[in-house]
Design a protein with these regions (language model features):
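S-adenosyl-L-methionine
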Residues: 1-27, 35-44
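Class I S-adenosylmethionine-dependent transferase superfamily signal
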Residues: 97, 124-125, 147
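Conserved beta-strand signature within the Rossmann-like core of class I S-adenosyl-L-methionine
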Residues: 130-138
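A short acidic, Gly/Pro-enriched loop at the edge of an enzyme's catalytic core
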Residues: 86-96
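SAM cofactor-binding core of SAM-dependent methyltransferases
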Residues: 24-83
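Class I S-adenosyl-L-methionine
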Residues: 145-209, 214-224
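A short SAM/SAH-binding and catalytic strip from SAM-dependent methyltransferases
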Residues: 94-114
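A short glycine-rich, Lys/Arg-flanked "PGG" loop and its adjoining helix->strand segment in the class I
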Residues: 116-130
């Protein structure tokens, strides 16, 4: 996707180049086996979906499922999510992010690998369209606290109190494990205010994300 970004000037042009069509864009970070993504992509064909997965094997498996089901409006990216959102995703171009049961990285030496940071939350907020949402779920209480601190405290999103526009009808493997041990599930929707503006210097850079690569096609997939 980084190669496409260097050829266009707006978020609309960027995503149209990636998908070969216009439409709202939703991004799932850490899709795992892809249960949510595959179901939502089949249910809402008018939406363009991006899956960002840090595990190459999971990304390749998901890409194979996407292709086998003919979901031409889905792209799978193998890369660190923080890098993709910071360097590649254009400002005010994403309708929703889906972040379900991210790894808590319990060991102290692994804390730097955690997804949630104030900087990441601000990047997410920059890329959301006004009224855009971050759907977040976890069974780890401190991650829920971190989500509120990052998305509300650092990024200026609001914790939505009214009913969300969508609800998950699938459960992740980690969610199932949490429910079996009686864990509390924390779930919420963080919203960018409809009147949100854009900082004068807010933009994605054209840098690439290390040695990571797209598993999904960067050219629009052919209809089958």
């Amino acid at each position: 996707m980084a190669g496409v970004y260097s050829q266009v000037t707006t978020g609309t042009e960027f995503w149209s180049s990636v998908f070969g069509r216009s439409g709202p864009v939703e991004i799932e970070i850490g899709p795992g086996t892809g249960a949510f993504l595959l179901q939502e992509a089949a249910r809402r064909p008018q939406v363009n979906f991006v899956a960002i997965e840090s595990s190459r094997s999971r990304a390749e498996n998901l890409e194979a499922l996407v292709r086998s089901r003919g979901l031409t409006h889905v792209r799978v990216v193998h890369a660190p999510a923080q890098c993709v959102v910071h360097h590649i995703v254009p400002t005010r171009s994403v309708a929703a992010y889906h972040i379900y049961f991210p790894d808590p990285w319990w060991k102290r030496r692994h804390h730097r690998r955690r997804l949630l940071t104030p900087a990441f939350a601000r990047d997410v907020a920059r890329t959301l369209v006004p009224g855009g949402l971050v759907a977040f779920a976890t069974d780890v209480d401190f991650l829920w606290t971190m989500a509120i601190q990052c998305f509300v405290g650092s990024a200026g999103l609001t914790l939505r109190e009214s009913a969300p526009p969508f609800r998950r009808s699938t459960r992740t493997r980690f969610e199932e494990k949490g429910l079996r041990r009686g864990a509390t599930i924390y779930e919420g929707w963080f919203e960018l205010p409809a009147e949100a503006g854009v900082a004068a210097n807010a933009s994605a850079s054209t840098s690439t994300c290390g040695n990571s690569s797209n598993v999904g096609p960067t050219e629009p997939a052919q209809e089958r």
